Every structure is written in C-alpha cells, then in structure tokens.
C-alpha cells in the first residue's frame, strides 16, 4: 500500500480524469470520485490532532449541538473508509511535493502560518488572507494525506476537477448522454432545473445546508447524516452527483457500494443556481471577479455558446517564498 510522504501524488491530468469519469458513467460501473480539502482534514485527523479550534470550525458546518466528539468520531471512521474506497481522490494543488517538519502541528499558530506560507504553493494574495488556524488546517491536511495508506489501484487528480468538468462542458456532455440522474444536495430546485435542461429523470435526496449560512435548514450532523443512507436507493449504474460538504464524501462511498457512479461536484451546485459560494476560486481559476456574480456560462439554463473564452483556467500555482 503506497504512502506519499511529501504528498508527491502521481495525479492524472484534467483531461485524463474527465475521460475516466466519462468511461465509468458509460459503463455504469460502481465508481466514486471525491475531493479532499482542509475541512476533511479536520475530520480525518480527529483521533490524534483535533483541537478546540477545529471543533469551532466544524460548528460553522453543522452547528454547535451537532459537533459532539461522538459525532465527529463516527464521521471520521466513515470518511476514512470513503477515502480508501474512492477510485479517484482530488488533492489540492498547494500541498503537493512539500515536506514539512514532523513537529509542525505542535508549534504556535503563527509559526505554522510562517512555514505553510513559505513551503506550500500558495499565492501571495491568499497568504495575506490566511489565518493561523487556516494554515493549521492545511498543515493537517498534508499530515493526514502524507501518512495515509493508499490502495494500489487508487488514482489522484486535482481537487478543482469539478470546476474543470463544468467549465470545459464535459459535465454537460455527460448529462446529455444519460437518462437518469441522482442528486444529493441542499438545493431542492436543482432537480427540476437539471431535468428540464438535459431532458433526464432526476431523483433528489435533500441535505441541510451549511449551518452558518442557513441555520434554519437544520443540522446535517448527526441527525440527518444518520438517516440519509437508507434514502440512497438509486438503481445500480445510476449517475449520482453529490454536493453535501464533508459528509458528501461518505455518501459517495455508500453510493458506490450500492452500485452507483458517484461524483463529488461540491460547489458546482451553487454555481448552477447562480450562487458564488467560492468567489476566490472563480477569480483565481477563471479571472472572474465581482463578489456574488456567477458568470452566465457557469449557470444552468438554456444552452450558451460553448466557447468558454473567459472560463479557461488562467492560474497554475507557483511556490511563493517570503
């Protein structure tokens, strides 16, 4: 079982990843593509590295009452299983090919930020916004992924692959070739939008939204999390798009186990309905600024000219030295 101590993952190119996804969808074979970020790191690193500040971070996702040690431990175990079971795992660009001091997570927040800012592939404007706790989560992500026992057959790609699927039109082409689509999302309007746009049958399993943003939607963890598995009753071979935060990675594994093709598309769901939940990604990846503005080309609706002129990714990370 390979280990990548410097996060030197042999990643597929974006076109290779997209082709692998298209093949899995066409073959209707059990499949899971998930993406890992600093939020997943907090849960994966629960046993040995979690701190009170990490629990506070999870409060923003699931609410104060939802973040109990028992609940986090439960999801941590399930998430590890999901990571081991994924066919393709999306890895952040900025942690690749980096070696960090073994004791880094035991240092002060400011010291962690200093090391992360110097060693990780982070753009200067991001460094200026990076908090000590944000830096710690990136360091924790590196620690977790660099010590994980990966499967021999697992493949890796960019954690931004969902945006490439969207911007290149590949996701549209995939949806135009299927008849049934499952959705795991907090956005009830998506089912009808996708059905009308692509002339497909949709089935939706609803999840609560991020607690900090929409507290009235309820707590995702632990209550809803524990009931969702029984609702993932899509037929074998069905393409299921998942955008459900940290628990969504687990749902991808459960879907794969039931014979589905599960793709973690995350914030693509937000873009489809015109919500710019990742404005920094829109700006850094596509050169699009404007706060809450999502460009028309990224939203669901009638077909648009596919010439992606301003949707071509314009940024590739470079190492920044202080």
What does each of the following model-derived ranges do?
Residues 1-199:
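Electropositive, gly/pro-rich neighborhoods at or near active sites that engage anionic ligands
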Residues 205-212, 266-271:
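Short, acidic/turn-prone active-site loops that include or flank metal/cofactor-
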Residues 247-322:
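C-terminal functional extensions of proteins
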Residues 214-235:
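Helix-loop module immediately N-terminal to the HCX5R catalytic loop
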Residues 175-177, 231-239:
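Short, surface-exposed connector motifs at secondary-structure boundaries
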Residues 183-185, 237-251, 264-266:
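Glycine-rich anion-binding loop/nest that anchors nucleotide
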Residues 90, 183, 204-207, 264:
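Structural signal for conserved beta-strand scaffold positions within catalytic alpha/beta enzyme cores
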């Amino acid at each position: 079982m390979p280990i990548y101590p410097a996060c030197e993952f042999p990643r597929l190119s974006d076109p290779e990843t997209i082709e692998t996804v298209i093949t899995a969808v066409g073959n209707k074979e059990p499949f899971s593509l998930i993406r890992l970020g600093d939020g997943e790191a907090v849960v994966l690193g629960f046993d040995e590295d979690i701190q009170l500040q990490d629990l506070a971070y999870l409060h923003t996702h699931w609410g104060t009452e939802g973040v109990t040690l028992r609940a986090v431990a439960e999801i941590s175990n399930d998430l590890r299983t999901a990571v081991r079971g994924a066919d393709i795992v999306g890895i952040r660009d900025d942690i690749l090919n980096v070696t960090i001091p073994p004791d880094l997570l035991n240092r002060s927040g400011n010291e962690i930020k200093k090391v992360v800012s110097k060693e990780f592939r982070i753009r200067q404007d991001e460094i200026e916004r990076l908090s000590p706790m944000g830096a710690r989560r990136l360091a924790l992500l590196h620690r977790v992924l660099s010590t994980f026992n990966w499967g021999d057959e697992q493949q890796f790609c960019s954690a931004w692959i969902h945006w490439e699927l969207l911007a290149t039109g590949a996701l549209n082409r995939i949806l135009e070739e299927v008849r049934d689509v499952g959705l795991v999302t907090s956005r009830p309007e998506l089912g009808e939008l996708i059905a009308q746009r692509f002339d497909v049958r949709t089935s939706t399993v609803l999840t609560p939204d991020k607690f900090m943003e929409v507290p009235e939607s309820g707590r995702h963890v632990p209550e809803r999390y524990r009931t969702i598995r029984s609702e993932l009753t899509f037929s074998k071979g069905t393409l299921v798009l998942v955008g459900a935060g940290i628990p969504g990675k687990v749902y991808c594994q459960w879907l794969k186990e039931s014979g589905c093709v599960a793709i973690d598309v995350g914030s693509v769901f937000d873009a489809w309905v015109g919500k710019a939940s990742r404005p920094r990604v829109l700006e850094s990846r596509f050169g699009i600024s404007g706060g809450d503005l999502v460009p028309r080309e990224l939203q669901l609706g009638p077909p648009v000219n596919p010439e992606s002129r301003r949707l071509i990714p314009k940024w590739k990370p470079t190492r920044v030295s202080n």
